[in-house]
Amino acid sequence: MAKQVIFNEQARAALKHGVDTLALAVKTTLGPRGRNVAMGKKWGAPSVTHDGVTVAKEVELKDPFQNMGAQLLKEAASKTNDVAGDGTTTATVLAQAMIDEGLKLVAAGANPMIFKRGLDKGREALVARIKEQSITLKSRDEIRQVATISAQDPEIGELLATIMDKIGHDGVVTIEEGKGTTLEYELVEGMQFDRGYISPYFVTDSSRMEAVIDEPYILITDKKISAVNDLLPILEAVLATGKKDLVIIAEDVDGEALATLVVNKMRGTLNALAVKAPGFGDRRKAMLQDIAILTGGTVISEEVGRKLDSAKVQDLGRARRVKSDKDNTVIVEGFGDKQAIQARIRQLKQQIETTTSDYDREKLQERVAKLSGGVAVIKVGAPTEPALKERKARVEDALNATRAAVEEGIVPGGGIALLNAIPALDNVQTQFEEERMALNILRRALEEPLRQLAINAGEDGSVVVNQVRTLQREHNNPNYGFDVMTGKYVDLMQAGIIDPAKVVRTALENAVSVAGIVLTTDALITDAPEPKKNGARTPSMPEEEF
């Protein structure tokens, strides 16, 4: 297929147009005084959002060369969202500022490759300074503040702080669309998996159709149990201990084995519950091992040379309670060794860091949460469909920001962390004039988020930046900044206006990366449009008279 190619000034102008178009749409959403963006669809109501990455994903320009600029800038937002889950608008604002100023210097004859080297040197110094500013997240109040700032909704902030209090920082939080108009949440204590009882005859509470067994022995196997002879040795061993509570987690239980369990349950000889093992294939084996570690049991598997009739009481797990309905089973407070559980959690976290699959990462995080004993479901409600989608996106942003803050700590919000990082550029060693130019552009770009926050709040951006610097010197306090909600200059840390350090760092790194790519691009290649074909006209049908 034929291609079209443009070079030099023409290529840079097309890229700049695409970058500016996307940035203008995205940066209006920055901060609590940012505007919403409505996105039309071919059918149904338009989506309304305040989320930078959602806006960025919607932008596709008609001109293919300009669209390249928009797509490159979109990368800064998308990568920031993938790593930190928030800060996408900040990344876009930073990247546009660097590209805008950098293209002027490239057009004036600066060498873009040396210029990029200067940007990279500056980035390293700035990232180190941001990490120095970071303070470890300590209190519930700080978690609430981070979530409130990200979602721009105190109710969401309070809800997430409450949930984090109850499930811990490793807990899994699932966000669903609710049926009402309010925010609600459910907590699931212990390890839950999506398999219920095999037979309704195991139910102990007929009004709720639940089977609840306190302090049972737990037999864990990846085998299908059909023959009663496989089960008899372990049933006799359990009864010999003086207890009759037994939970069986197996691939399946049917035939004589199931009939024996049900009959003994109904007679009161044995208080049994049989549930299917969770997951499939290798994931099932891993989850059964998780259950074994949590309960202090052993997985009885022929893969390791163990047959079911060789199981002893010492191989069985224990838990304070096991609760099962037709769809789910929950193991509460397993009696497993705490050190073994923590070692398993560390192992899973290492796998999370190395995996490249988003699906695998999500499943591993769920397993960590289940071992940690915390799963929460947030049900987001709103009066209308567009409002529901917009609110759900804000809850997701707030959750991601909270996790990022727990991971790397917090810094002053309102663009101040970036402003305070600027002096770090004074110590960067440069060899060429273009490197010094790059550092000057970084100095200007780092002011841009604060400037844009002020503009969105109806203030003069440059005046606000100068006033913040003056007040920081007067009060000898680097945390002084501009509160866009009140229009006052305050100590942002005391006022609870804080950002996760990971979000600020990731936004800066991705902005510098994308700016470097755009500034060093000198030719653009895209598919040439196909010429319109004049198709043969379809002859009209002759009119007939009836």
From Swiss-Prot:
Biological process (GO), any one: protein refolding
Matching Gene3D superfamilies: GroEL, GroEL-like equatorial domain, TCP-1-like chaperonin intermediate domain
Keyword Acyltransferase part of the UniProt annotation: no
Broadest EC class assigned to this enzyme: isomerase
Residues reported in the UniProt entry to bind ATP: 29-32, 86-90, 414, 499
Superkingdom per UniProt: Bacteria
Listed PROSITE patterns: CHAPERONINS_CPN60 (PS00296)
Catalytic activity: ATP + H2O + a folded polypeptide = ADP + phosphate + an unfolded polypeptide
GO cellular component: cytoplasm
Compartment(s): Cytoplasm
Gene Ontology MF term list: ATP binding; ATP-dependent protein folding chaperone; isomerase activity; unfolded protein binding
InterPro entries (alphabetical): Chaperonin_Cpn60_CS, Cpn60/GroEL, Cpn60/GroEL/TCP-1, GroEL-like_apical_dom_sf, GROEL-like_equatorial_sf, TCP-1-like_intermed_sf
Assigned EC number: 5.6.1.7
Keywords, comma-separated and alphabetical: ATP-binding, Chaperone, Cytoplasm, Isomerase, Nucleotide-binding
Assembly description: Forms a cylinder of 14 subunits composed of two heptameric rings stacked back-to-back. Interacts with the co-chaperonin GroES.
Task performed by this protein: Together with its co-chaperonin GroES, plays an essential role in assisting protein folding. The GroEL-GroES system forms a nano-cage that allows encapsulation of the non-native substrate proteins and provides a physical environment optimized to promote and accelerate protein folding.
Family listed: Belongs to the chaperonin (HSP60) family.
NCBIfam families the UniProt entry points to: GroEL, PRK00013.1, PRK12849.1, PRK12850.1, PRK12851.1
Protein name, per record: Chaperonin GroEL 1
Gene transcribed to yield this protein: groEL1
